[in-house]
């Protein structure tokens, strides 16, 4: 734009100088007409350039506006999606919390019901040892089973933990450590109190005694128990060498009876001699019968 203004000013200056020069009127008119035509052409060209520039700017502005609108819509869509996801997550979490609250509403009152089961189990354990109340054991068992079934109906289940199971702190609580040769280390050797679950949540850990492994011997594997048969030799010794080889004999000791090895030696009387009588004391005592020993002649 600045260059075009300079050109217009220069053209006007030329026109002014042309008018001031003394020339013929026709030549002046022709020159003025030509100059004006040229100026009009330049002005038209400049106007066209300006219009093209304005159109280009307008088009670029429209594209920029469209891109801006598109980006704004994308940002709004993403933001709205995040808001919807967050709302859905909160609704889902709220529903889960409400469901869990309904599901585990009786968790606080479970202890009293489990204590009743513990007391019935203790009563059965001692009733089986007392013959006076042994006849009532079957009735106690019926009451206990019906109560356990009622607990199962409200989704309170007894965990199946027995001696020999591997200790697991998720479901068990070790109250004692004992030496039991029947169980390896870190294994349950006794269950003092049963554990219970409400649905999949542990409401009471099982109270167990854990073996320390002292005195436990691992059972031999089946491969070790089978006796190994010696491999047969493919080479056979020559018959002549085995026949001609002198047999080496070892001195044999007289057989002894292992049962009499720890007994003191019995001293027998020599043949053809009377047995030696013990010395008699001077103090009088009860008369003992006289026994005669018959000695057989060999």
Swiss-Prot record:
Recorded superkingdom: Bacteria
Pfam families: GrpE
Compositional bias (Polar residues): 221-243
Location relative to the cell: Cytoplasm
PROSITE patterns membership: GRPE
Low complexity bias: start-end ranges: 245-265
Main location group: cytoplasm
GO biological process: protein folding
Alphabetical UniProt keywords: Chaperone, Cytoplasm, Stress response
Disulfide pairings: none
InterPro entries listed in its UniProt record: GrpE (IPR000740), GrpE_coiled_coil (IPR013805), GrpE_head (IPR009012)
GO terms, molecular function: adenyl-nucleotide exchange factor activity; protein homodimerization activity; protein-folding chaperone binding; unfolded protein binding
Region (Disordered): 218-298
Membrane-spanning ranges: none
CDD domains registered for this protein in UniProt: GrpE (cd00446)
GO cellular component terms attached to this protein's record: cytoplasm
Similarity field: Belongs to the GrpE family.
HAMAP family given in the database record: GrpE
Assembly: Homodimer.
Function: Participates actively in the response to hyperosmotic and heat shock by preventing the aggregation of stress-denatured proteins, in association with DnaK and GrpE. It is the nucleotide exchange factor for DnaK and may function as a thermosensor. Unfolded proteins bind initially to DnaJ; upon interaction with the DnaJ-bound protein, DnaK hydrolyzes its bound ATP, resulting in the formation of a stable complex. GrpE releases ADP from DnaK; ATP binding to DnaK triggers the release of the substrate protein, thus completing the reaction cycle.
Protein's name according to its UniProt entry: Protein GrpE
Native source organism of the sequence: Mycoplasmoides gallisepticum (strain R(low / passage 15 / clone 2))
């Amino acid at each position: 734009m600045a260059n075009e203004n300079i050109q217009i000013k220069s053209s006007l200056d030329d026109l002014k100088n042309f008018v001031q020069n003394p020339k013929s009127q026709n030549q002046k008119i022709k020159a003025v007409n030509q100059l004006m035509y040229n100026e009009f052409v330049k002005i038209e060209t400049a106007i066209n350039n300006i219009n093209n520039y304005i159109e280009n700017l307008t088009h670029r502005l429209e594209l920029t506006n469209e891109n801006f609108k598109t980006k704004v819509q994308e940002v709004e869509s993403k933001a709205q999606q995040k808001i919807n996801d967050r709302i859905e997550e909160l609704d889902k979490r709220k529903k889960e919390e409400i469901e869990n609250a309904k599901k585990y509403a009786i968790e606080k009152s479970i202890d009293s019901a489990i204590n009743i089961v513990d007391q019935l189990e203790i009563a059965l354990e001692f009733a089986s040892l007392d013959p006076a109340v042994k006849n009532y054991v079957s009735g106690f068992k019926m009451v206990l089973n019906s109560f356990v079934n009622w607990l199962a109906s409200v989704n309170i289940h007894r965990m199946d933990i027995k001696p020999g199971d591997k200790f697991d702190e998720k479901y068990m609580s070790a109250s004692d450590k004992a030496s039991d040769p029947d169980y390896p280390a870190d294994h349950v050797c006794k269950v003092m109190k049963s554990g219970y679950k409400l649905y999949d949540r542990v409401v009471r850990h099982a109270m167990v005694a854990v073996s320390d492994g002292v005195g436990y011997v691992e059972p031999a594997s089946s491969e070790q128990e089978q006796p190994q048969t010696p491999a047969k030799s493919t080479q056979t010794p020559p018959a002549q060498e085995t026949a001609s080889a002198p047999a080496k004999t070892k001195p044999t000791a007289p057989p002894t009876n292992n049962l009499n090895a720890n007994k003191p030696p019995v001293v027998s009387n020599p043949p053809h001699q009377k047995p030696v009588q013990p010395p008699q004391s001077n103090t009088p005592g009860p008369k003992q019968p006289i026994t005669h020993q018959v000695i057989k002649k060999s």
